[in-house]
Amino acid sequence: MSEQESDEVKRMKQLEEARKRVEELKKKKNKKNKGKKNKNSSATGSIGSETPDLEGTPGEESTQEETVKANSTKSENNDQNDVDEESEEKEIEQVKSDPSGTTEKDIEEINSTSSNVGKDDAENTKKEEVQEVIKNNNDEQTADAGKTIEPQEEKKIVQTQEGNEPSNTSEAADDLFANDGNEESDFLTTIKKQKEEDELTKLRAENEKLTQENKQLKFLNMENETTVDDLQDQLQEKEDIINGLQNDLQTARDELIAAVEKLKLAEAKAARNTTATPIQFADFNTSSNNLTPSQSVTNSGTQVAHGNNMEVDRVMLNKWRQWNVDMTTWRSIGSGPIMEF
């Protein structure tokens, strides 16, 4: 069995127990009411038997004794009714106070049973009031009979009072039924008020939670705004640095381009200023072979000096730079003339 089925079974059992309790209370009340009726009938019989003795006694003493007896019976009946009602209310409240087993339908059923019990109580109280009124009237009639000793007039008075009693009892019944309706309405209103109070407490708790969450979100929003501002400031600083570096790079590029252009112009000017010189071959004499070593050294020195004073073609040298060697002043090994390349 599932949890729902077990809960339903528990509720049904509790309802059956409540109904049984209400029925038992009804039976107890009916028994008590029957006992009260028997007591009242015995009291009326005793009063009727005492009426002939009252003829010789004064009327005031008899009326006082009878009123005292009636008041004592009323107080006893009222005390018993109060005790019964308190016990019933306690049991009904115990049934209603079970939060796990009772629902709205169950409460309505219990209320209907309690209202029926209240109606029965009202009817019983009405009957008791009628009996008390009859007793009082009988007492008054006996007092009048003791004074006047006119049984025929007593019968007429009893008949007239009995004719007036139904109207009084109907009014009392209307008042009692109205009170029962008010009790039911009061019970329902209390339930509604309790529900409204519960809803209000829930809504207040939710409102408090939402307000706290709103405050937390506001603080988070403020923190996020501050972090965003800081990041924006940092980004602005980085952008300024980048812009400065870009400007420096642009100026460096411009300077480099200007330097390259100047170098090109200088090279062009140097190329224009240089004049091409023809290749000159050295004049070799045959007598040079017969020269002495000292003479050959002097001749080579003069040739070297002459070669240094020569103007060299820079264009040709640049063309053969780094892979050709200038061998114009070199002397070949062996015999033969010295040639200039």
Curated annotation (Swiss-Prot):
A single Gene Ontology CC term: cis-Golgi network
Keyword terms of this UniProt record: Acetylation, Coiled coil, Cytoplasm, ER-Golgi transport, Golgi apparatus, Membrane, Phosphoprotein, Transport
Cellular localization per UniProt: Cytoplasm; Golgi apparatus, cis-Golgi network membrane
Extent of Basic and acidic residues compositional bias: 7-26, 118-132
Single biological process term from Gene Ontology: protein secretion
Biased composition (Acidic residues): 79-91
Major subcellular location class: cytoplasm
Ranges of compositional bias, category Polar residues: 69-78, 158-171
Origin superkingdom: Eukaryota
Membrane topology label: Peripheral membrane protein
Signal peptide (residue range): none
Molecular function via GO: identical protein binding
Phosphothreonine found at: 292
Ranges in a coiled coil: 2-41, 188-272
Disordered: region residues: 1-181
Function description: Involved in ER to Golgi vesicle-mediated transport by either facilitating USO1-dependent and -independent tethering or increasing target accuracy of fusion events of COPII-coated vesicles.
Note in the entry: Present with 5220 molecules/cell in log phase SD medium.
Protein name: Binder of USO1 and GRH1 protein 1
Organism of this sequence: Saccharomyces cerevisiae (strain ATCC 204508 / S288c)
Taxon lineage: Eukaryota, Fungi, Dikarya, Ascomycota, Saccharomycotina
Gene of this entry: BUG1
